[in-house]
């Protein structure tokens, strides 16, 4: 049973930009209802009631398990072949670098063509690349440069895949269940991230990296099959945007005119560059600090995924989506990374990784939801591609940088910097937003449930 429609008493409407001249109709964001009441627990994953989205989520879950297996196996194989954490960072950078330079064009293509067809082509290409890496590894002919080339090729696939995948969720469920579907997608991603590293650790120890790559090739094929069986008549298809001059500039101007888009972009930039290269740092901790081997590396990644899974589920229960949610989550993620740098043993380090994973996902889902619900379908592909340029491109910069810091300054100081910069940025942004909105913290010792509250100062006439 679907949740009741929100009443006027508990729905807030975003502010629509007021300009001296009316903007084009396709770039005006219509008011989007934001439900402020807490939904019953039975509606936590209500978007799965949509048959097409349920099929997509199952395929996504299988694919995520396999891609996590490939990521762990790929990073560990590069570390073993080269003996260098920096080489692992370069691999990450090559996989993300195309999105940094070509991401906006990927978003423009997502706005102009059918998202489902784009995803089918991209997943087919990913299957071929994974199969090639599996053959090289199983034949024991793989070299570091092979991994570099395949990682770069996969990066070009990601340029088209990611913006189309982000916008396709809306075509599966429609605007009614969009926020919930984004959270469910994050939940399946993190659940797969919990299972994938654990399976990767077993495969690396028992059979070798090649079988992890082979599993990902099969999973990509299964994703293609599930995309093909989706019912077209149940898709919420949007009209393709006709080609015209200045489409990329239009998307950028649109995003920069909306605080609910550009502030999440800014925080995503700090988090992506400094705090999204955890696999690089975890490889350094597993190999150089705790001497835990491939199994320990998989375990640390699984701990992050466990916390992220909890964060993804918690994000489905979020009553309201505000800028303060985005900034606070980013700040707490950075703080948890700082705390982890002080942990004396692998057990305590693993505990802080669970907390870091939780707040990382609370931030990522909040930022994603806010950017998507603040933009119209006709321009959303370009807006999301620019957001992904910041998020993925930041990782391309941060991967080698954090690898270099871990090698030359040590893993502990590297993870302290990794968390410290986003935490400081969150504090600065919070102060700026508070001043713009005349907000301050109120202490009320009589209210045990809400001792601290953020309130707006009354405006003087």
Q: Can you say where each PLM-predicted feature lies in the sequence?
A:
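Alpha-helical transmembrane-bundle signature of multi-pass membrane transport and export proteins
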Residues: 2-461
């Amino acid at each position: 049973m679907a949740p009741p429609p929100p009443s006027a008493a508990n729905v807030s409407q975003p502010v629509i930009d007021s300009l001296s001249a009316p903007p084009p109709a396709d770039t005006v964001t219509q008011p989007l209802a934001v439900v402020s009441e807490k939904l019953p627990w039975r509606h936590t994953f209500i978007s799965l009631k949509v048959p097409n989205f349920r099929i997509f989520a199952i395929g996504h879950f299988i694919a995520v398990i396999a891609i996590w297996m490939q990521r762990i196996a790929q990073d560990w194989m590069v570390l073993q072949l080269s003996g260098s954490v920096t080489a692992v960072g370069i691999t990450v950078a090559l996989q993300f670098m195309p999105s940094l330079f070509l991401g906006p064009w990927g978003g423009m293509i997502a706005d102009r063509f059918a998202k489902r067809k784009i995803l089918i082509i991209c997943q087919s290409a990913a299957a071929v690349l994974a199969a090639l890496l599996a053959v090289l590894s199983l034949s024991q002919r793989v070299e570091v440069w092979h991994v570099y080339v395949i990682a770069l090729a996969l990066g070009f696939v990601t340029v088209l895949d990611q913006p189309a995948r982000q916008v396709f969720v809306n075509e599966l469920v429609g605007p009614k269940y969009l926020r919930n579907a984004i959270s469910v997608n994050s939940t399946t991603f993190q659940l797969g991230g919990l299972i994938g590293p654990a399976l990767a650790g077993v495969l690396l120890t028992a059979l070798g990296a090649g079988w992890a790559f082979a599993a990902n090739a099969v999973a990509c094929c299964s994703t293609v099959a599930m995309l093909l069986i989706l019912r077209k008549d149940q898709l919420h298809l949007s009209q393709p945007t006709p080609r015209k001059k200045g489409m990329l500039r239009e998307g950028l101007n649109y995003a920069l005119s909306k605080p609910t888009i550009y502030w999440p972009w800014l925080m995503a930039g700090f988090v992506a560059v400094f705090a999204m290269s955890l696999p690089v740092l975890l490889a350094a901790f597993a190999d150089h600090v705790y001497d835990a081997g491939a199994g320990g590396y998989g375990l640390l990644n699984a701990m992050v995924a466990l916390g992220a899974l909890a964060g993804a589920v918690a994000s489905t229960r979020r009553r309201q989506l505000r800028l303060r949610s985005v900034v606070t989550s980013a700040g707490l993620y950075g703080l948890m990374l700082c705390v982890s740098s002080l942990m004396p043993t692998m057990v305590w380090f693993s505990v802080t990784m669970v907390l870091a994973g939780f707040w990382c996902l609370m931030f990522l889902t909040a930022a994603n939801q806010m950017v998507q619900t603040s933009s119209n379908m006709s321009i959303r592909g370009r807006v999301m591609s620019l957001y992904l340029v910041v998020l993925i491109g930041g990782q391309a910069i941060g991967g080698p940088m954090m690898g270099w810091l871990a090698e030359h300054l040590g893993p502990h100081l590297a993870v302290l910097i990794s968390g410290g910069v986003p935490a400081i940025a969150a504090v600065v942004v919070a102060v700026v937003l508070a001043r713009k909105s005349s907000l301050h913290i109120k202490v009320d010792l009589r209210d045990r449930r809400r001792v601290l509250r953020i309130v707006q100062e009354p405006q003087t006439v």
